[in-house]
Amino acid sequence: MNYIPYVIEKTGRGERSYDIYSRLLKDRIIMLSGEINDGVASSIVSQMLFLEAEDPEKDIYLYINSPGGVITSGMSIYDTMNYVKPDICTICIGQAASMGAFLLSCGTKGKRFSLPNSRIMIHQPLGGAQGQATDIEIQAKEILRLKSILNGILASNTGQPLEKIAKDTDRDFFMSAQESKEYGLIDNVLEKSFK
């Protein structure tokens, strides 16, 4: 069971209680924690759209601590990151693996960060298929199509050649924060808050 802390904010009109995520949203901070699925993606997308409507000129800060998750859910977040006008600052806290690492790399260039002891992992898409041979063939073609799309975006985000991305994502490829900076997934390793 997840415990969600509440914070008290004092104003000129008294006190107001917020759950911590609502309070962070006031500061344009979105937390992407845990597995990426349709529910998590809907929440992240909704928050980005809300923050764009509030102020399309101010950056949005997306903190990521995720083992990855469903490709289509992650792609809805990715598409929204590109769709909204504000720059998206991505910050890895803990880990960004699989789709989490992909989204970390998709922040606005120059605004992709990691804390020093985070780990980042990229790999090829995971999938499974069952049913008739033709159904399995259809699923295999689709996962190869998604692999090609993801590798192309990672190559663009990192500046690495597509062939290197394909080789490195063939199996789990773990990096430290510093190694992910050298690879091009992030732009800087943060020791202190930059806000």
UniProtKB/Swiss-Prot annotation:
Q: GO molecular function terms here?
A: ATP-dependent peptidase activity; ATPase binding; serine-type endopeptidase activity
Q: What class of enzyme is it?
A: hydrolase
Entry-linked InterPro entries: ClpP, ClpP/crotonase-like_dom_sf, ClpP/TepA, ClpP_His_AS, ClpP_Ser_AS
The keyword Protease is assigned to this record:
yes
Write out the function statement from the record.
Cleaves peptides in various proteins in a process that requires ATP hydrolysis. Has a chymotrypsin-like activity. Plays a major role in the degradation of misfolded proteins.
GO process annotations (BP)? protein quality control for misfolded or incompletely synthesized proteins
Q: Which CDD domains match?
A: S14_ClpP_2
Annotated gene: clpP
Q: Any idea which UniProt keywords this protein has?
A: Cytoplasm, Hydrolase, Protease, Serine protease
Keyword Hydrolase assigned? yes
This protein's GO CC annotations? cytoplasm; endopeptidase Clp complex
State where it is primarily located. cytoplasm
Q: Where in the cell does this protein reside?
A: Cytoplasm
What Pfam families does the record point to? CLP_protease
Q: PROSITE patterns this protein is in?
A: CLP_PROTEASE_HIS, CLP_PROTEASE_SER
Catalytic center at which residues? 98, 123
Q: State the oligomer form and interacting partners.
A: Fourteen ClpP subunits assemble into 2 heptameric rings which stack back to back to give a disk-like structure with a central cavity, resembling the structure of eukaryotic proteasomes.
- EC code: 3.4.21.92
Where does this protein have coiled-coil stretches? Answer: none
What is this protein called in UniProt?
A: ATP-dependent Clp protease proteolytic subunit
Per its record, the protein catalyses: Hydrolysis of proteins to small peptides in the presence of ATP and magnesium. alpha-casein is the usual test substrate. In the absence of ATP, only oligopeptides shorter than five residues are hydrolyzed (such as succinyl-Leu-Tyr-|-NHMec, and Leu-Tyr-Leu-|-Tyr-Trp, in which cleavage of the -Tyr-|-Leu- and -Tyr-|-Trp bonds also occurs)
Transmembrane ranges, per UniProt, are none
Per the record, the similarity remark reads: Belongs to the peptidase S14 family.
